[in-house]
Amino acid sequence: MKAELIAVGTEILTGQITNTNAQFLSEKLAELGIDVYFHTAVGDNENRLLSVLDQSSKRSDLVILCGGLGPTEDDLTKQTLAKFLGKELIFDEEASKKLDSFFATRPKHTRTPNNERQAQIVEGAVPLQNLTGLAVGGIITVEGVTYVVLPGPPSELKPMVNQELIPALTENHTTLYSRVLRFFGVGESQLVTIIKDLIVNQTDPTIAPYAKVGEVTLRLSTKASSQEEADRKLDVLEEQIRSTKTLDGKSLSDLIYGYGESNSLAYEVFYLLKKYGKTITAAESLTAGLFQASVADFPGASQVFKGGFVTYSMEEKAKMLDIPLSKLEEHGVVSHFTAEKMAEGARVKTDSDYGIALTGVAGPDALEGHQAGTVFIGIADRNQVRSIKVVIGGRSRSDVRYISTLYAFNLVRQALLQEDNSI
């Protein structure tokens, strides 16, 4: 279905007001699976509006007119639409009663003949009641084209759309359903290359990639008449994506860490720690507490996080985590050794199930011969300790610190999932 929005009002063309209704309606129609092809604005002029309606009726299936339903002489939307369709204007009983009630409770207000037009609808139209104002809207289908008239003020338009128009449209149209897959460990351009065939051949469902700092999301969208139908279609596409091999032969499934628009690696780790009844601590150098702050963002963090350490200098690493200073000097603070000893020391001191540690070069200058963006992340549990090295190149200092925490959370997530598989 092709939809078109027509904003009626000279004040829009002269820049006196901003057409926020177009954005609101476009978002709502997209949620219903209705594609908006055109945005049009026309002044308060019958001939020009008739010309626009003639054009719209030839290229769109759904034409929504906003504004021009009031009592003044330049409010001519309903009259012009009725003329275009060759129909009369008639009074809607419910809207007329509301008008009667309005003036009955306001005896000082004079009820003039032009007020009556607010209760009129195009003959044959289904009324759309105005929950916050007096001007009734309407919806009518003629020769395969559906026309909708809505009031201009957003305070009246939005309730009418949400409570009157959307139910009317969803009786006969599909809804847009979406599922968001979240990836870590692959860039947007690389991911798009990997699933190029799926993107090129997409029809319904569709795939839309979005790059975020340190991660990528794929929004899978489909038009369906129910959530169950949508899930069936999205399940098929998701499985195709998961089974696709990366450039180094791995499964894309291994790079998907979760679902949802507002999900995060930090939340996934928090959820898994609670699920398995595990606790974690952290010792941070370059990230200076960023990992710990991310855990503490979630209500109930005290169930999984006992406390942690920010050991920025070599001396504090030695003093707070019981690492021999001579060994730190020998291996350097930017090393596998230091990351592992930090993780192990933090875990032992707090008697936590997991200890995570981050040490490295946030930049912009190099340190100990390591380029900016070089990070060592250690992880310790009650049985073993290990570490990884990552190089986050071409990023700002703040990005290096943030992306480092993502790698740390992903390392913990993988460890927790391995523990789940061993149960």
UniProtKB/Swiss-Prot annotation:
SUPFAM superfamilies: CinA-like, Molybdenum cofactor biosynthesis proteins. Pfam families: CinA, CinA_KH, MoCF_biosynth. It comes from the Bacteria. SMART domains: MoCF_biosynth. Belongs to the CinA family. HAMAP family: CinA_B. This is Putative competence-damage inducible protein.
